């Protein structure tokens, strides 16, 4: 029997009949599996079960699963287990993977939103954007947040209902509208990495929404596979507690995105199309586009092979820090260091006090928000050399001091931001840091978890702040562009106190950059907005004079250009009501508020015909005030019919290729239920 085992294993190893470890159950005679398991712990799942076990040796389904696990990992299960043993041994001995490295503050750019330097980098980023490909790492469900679905389906803002996925797709569409000489002729590609948990829902959301305006050909959905779990420090494969005939599996980490881009051939395809940059971002940050373009501009100007979007980070905050790590031979690498490694590393080397604040009140090591810009040429060279496989780590929770058994199974993991470890030594790696208000407000925590973070003085990073921070950023940007907006008021939602600004939201089709916002406000524009107001702008709309105290929605379909010459809107408007515990809507639960939209409390202007449209003063009528719409109170009033009385009026001058002139039309002809008009 032993001779037979040796011969069969030799044949397997030589590739003559190798089908991976799952095939062993078929090629070994009965009883041999137990012999093999006794001398080779990694095949312990083939051994007969202990009496207390509910399952037997891997059933047919389990063996098929093992075969699948073998083919889905580069090098197969043999390589996976070999890597696991090395890392588990180092973990058991307490070895530090950063041993011998000395941390220091890396090279990067610190930008202030809206100033001249920021605008210069953003302008360069706009010119580089059509040469980019985008990769959205979206493997997460919203269950931990209290949302029953994929996180990409959560509304980035409740006032419009745009999901995060729609918001990102519309942003990519807007970037393609920047006409740059020499840019690839095709659409800007979007790659979405999903998981077993999110793949079907993500594809369904794209299908039912007609890809949010993107073409099917430009969207690529790649599913990440799971890896086998390990039961102890000998890297024995763990049985699934829910089905002991199966191997337990867990996600490998978002670092798999690099291998998927390599094996799918997409990275090479993008390079052949003339793409210079590949941009990685994550699934629930509504402020991503506010900072991304300037980061791309910094990469182009500074020649960064990799550039991380960063934010100021509180000392010892549970957020990875970007650091320059110098080796004993003088060479160095700039990369993310996890917060639980950074402080002890500093104490052991250059800073006895560890990770402490500097004169700014923040740690000198910028916070990593996992938005990355990589130069395609360097990235492709790295993929070709590594096949997209990046450094792995293991994080077991030991059951006792022997450090042999685990409290629960573990697995190997890898992180997307670890790619600098694989870049060539000469590659220039840096960061671009922005204030948090304009760049980073992810939806990461449940309402209960967010309250705890709020109580300790940390940012809640919840559904509540994800939306209210977007309002605040938009109001601040409009003020920088010349608008006058009332200051915020204190409100509390889900136990979190926020500074609630006017609910100002615009689509990327209105503006995707600060320069775009400034261009949408005419020179010497007079825009005044009260704090209780809601303003939604979608499309090619120029504001010259607008006074808003209430709710106003303006939509311009593609090909339509709207100029607001003068418009005064005062109506009941929309209100944010604190959520009721009994509210069945999960989005209301995670955000902590619902939006009350009383009948007749909204002024909607929707322009669906192509051409130039100008909204200017029109004659008044006695019933106009109740609709909250005025244009020029000094103009004479005129009587309206009973049918007209229910509709606000305005004057619109349309200048189209086929005709011109002025027409006066009821609002109903231009207004449609939002958001249907933009579809």
Language model features: what each stretch is:
Residues 6-18, 22-25, 32, 37, 42-44, ...:
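N-terminal chloroplast transit peptides
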């Amino acid at each position: 029997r032993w001779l037979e085992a040796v011969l069969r294993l030799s044949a397997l190893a030589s590739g003559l009949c190798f089908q991976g470890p799952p095939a062993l159950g078929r090629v070994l005679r009965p009883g041999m599996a137990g012999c093999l398991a006794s001398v080779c712990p990694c095949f312990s799942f083939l051994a007969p079960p202990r009496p207390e076990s509910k399952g037997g040796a891997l059933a047919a389904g389990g063996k098929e699963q093992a075969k699948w696990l073998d083919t889905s990992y580069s090098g197969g299960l043999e390589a996976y287990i070999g890597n696991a043993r090395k890392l588990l041994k180092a973990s058991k001995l307490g070895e530090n993977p950063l041993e011998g490295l000395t941390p220091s503050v890396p090279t990067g750019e610190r930008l202030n939103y809206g100033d001249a330097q920021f605008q210069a980098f953003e302008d360069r980023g706009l010119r580089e954007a059509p040469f980019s490909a985008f990769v959205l790492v979206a493997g997460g469900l919203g269950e931990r947040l209290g949302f029953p679905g994929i996180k990409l389906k959560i509304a980035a803002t409740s006032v419009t209902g745009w999901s995060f996925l729609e918001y990102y797709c519309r942003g990519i569409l807007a970037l393609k509208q920047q006409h740059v000489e020499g840019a690839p002729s095709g659409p800007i590609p979007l790659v979405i990495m999903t998981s077993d948990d999110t793949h079907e829902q993500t594809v369904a959301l794209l299908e039912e929404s007609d890809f949010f305006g993107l073409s099917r050909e430009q969207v690529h959905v790649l599913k990440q596979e799971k890896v086998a779990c390990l039961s102890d420090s000998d890297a024995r494969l763990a049985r699934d507690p829910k089905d002991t005939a199966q191997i337990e599996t867990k996600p490998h980490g978002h670092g798999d995105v690099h291998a998927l881009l390599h094996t799918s051939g997409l990275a090479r395809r993008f390079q052949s199309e003339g793409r210079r940059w590949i941009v990685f971002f994550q699934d629930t940050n509504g402020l991503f586009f506010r900072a991304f373009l300037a980061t791309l501009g910094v990469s182009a100007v500074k020649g960064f092979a990799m550039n991380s979007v960063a934010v100021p980070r509180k000392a010892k905050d549970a957020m990875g820090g970007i650091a320059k790590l110098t080796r004993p031979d003088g060479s160095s690498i700039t990369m993310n260091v996890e917060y639980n490694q950074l402080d002890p590393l500093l104490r052991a080397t250059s800073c006895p006090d560890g990770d402490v604040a500097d004169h700014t009140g923040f740690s000198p090591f910028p916070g990593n928000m996992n938005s990355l810009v990589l130069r395609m040429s360097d990235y492709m060279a790295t993929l070709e050399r590594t096949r997209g496989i990046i450094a792995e780590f293991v994080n077991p929770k030991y059951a006792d001091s022997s450090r042999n058994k685990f409290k629960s199974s573990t697995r190997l993991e890898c992180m997307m931001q670890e790619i600098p470890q694989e870049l060539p030594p000469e590659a220039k790696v840096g960061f671009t840091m922005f204030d948090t208000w304009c760049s980073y407000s992810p939806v990461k925590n449940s309402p209960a978890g967010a309250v705890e973070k709020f109580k300790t003085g940390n940012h809640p990073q919840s559904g509540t702040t994800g939306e209210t921070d977007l309002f605040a950023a938009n109001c601040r940007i409009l003020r920088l562009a010349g608008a006058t907006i009332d200051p915020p008021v204190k409100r509390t939602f889900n136990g979190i106190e926020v500074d609630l600004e006017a609910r100002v939201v615009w689509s990327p089709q209105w503006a995707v950059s600060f320069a775009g916002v400034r261009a949408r406000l005419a020179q010497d524009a007079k825009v005044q907005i009260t704090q209780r107001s809601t303003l939604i702008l979608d499309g090619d709309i120029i504001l010259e004079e607008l006074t808003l105290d209430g709710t106003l929605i303006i939509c311009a379909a593609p090909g339509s250009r709207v100029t607001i010459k003068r418009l005064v809107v005062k109506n009941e408007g929309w209100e944010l009501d604190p959520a009721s515990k009994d509210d069945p809507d999960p989005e209301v639960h995670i955000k902590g508020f619902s939006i009350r939209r009383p009948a007749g409390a909204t002024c909607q202007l929707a322009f669906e015909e192509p051409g130039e449209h100008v909204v200017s003063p029109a004659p008044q009528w006695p019933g106009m005030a109740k609709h909250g719409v005025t244009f020029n109170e000094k103009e004479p009033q005129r009587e309206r019919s009973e049918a007209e009385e229910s509709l606000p009026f305005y004057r619109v001058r349309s200048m189209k290729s086929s005709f011109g002139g002025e027409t006066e039309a009821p609002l109903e002809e231009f207004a449609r239920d939002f958001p249907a008009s933009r579809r």
